Amino acid sequence: LYGAPGWRLGLLAMNENNIFGRLIHELPVDEQAAINDRYRLVETDPDKLPFIERIAADSRSIGLYHTSGLSTPQQMMEVLFALTHLVYANGSTDAYIDECRYVVNRRYTDLVKGLGIEADNSRTNAKYYTLIDIYKLAEEKYGKQFRKYFEKSFAQIDFLMKLSEDNGVILMDGVGFGTQPGIIRVSEANLPSKAYGVIAEKINELLEEYCEKYLKTKK
């Protein structure tokens, strides 16, 4: 829903007999039929699907509803993913895998080029996730003195919160992945390709805004 896999923004609890489920069943027959068609892909009897399960299904593409738990289809997909390595082990290639690599690489390139930072094209960089040091980026763009001000005055969580509130871009705090403070994480896995240039643009705009605040303190 937010393009931030693994980030839980809240907890939802609901009585088994709730008003939402009742209101759905009080809808006109044609509207109920349309709703049932929506969930028929993942539920053989969608009319009995609890409202809270509908929310879980709608938190992503409904066809991916099973990813809210380790289901048999998900286990089968894991097996198929593992078997794809046999293709490359035999010296062959796979058009789908090659296309996925191309798409992820293009998104990564758009991101780092937009930020004006050097790309890491080493074999160990899968480019699935990108870790960005916002303090280092601040120094590269506006100098050491600004970095000192920025690092002393704002935590990376302040940057992330403002980025989401003002620019609608939600990224992850890298500390949860074992990084040092100041690192934010971008996933190249799940957003439209055109979004990565926009993410870079919004990060740059926010850094510029912080720099303007810094310059005002110097007057």
Indicate residue ranges for each PLM-predicted region.
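PLP-dependent class I/II
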Residues: 1-219
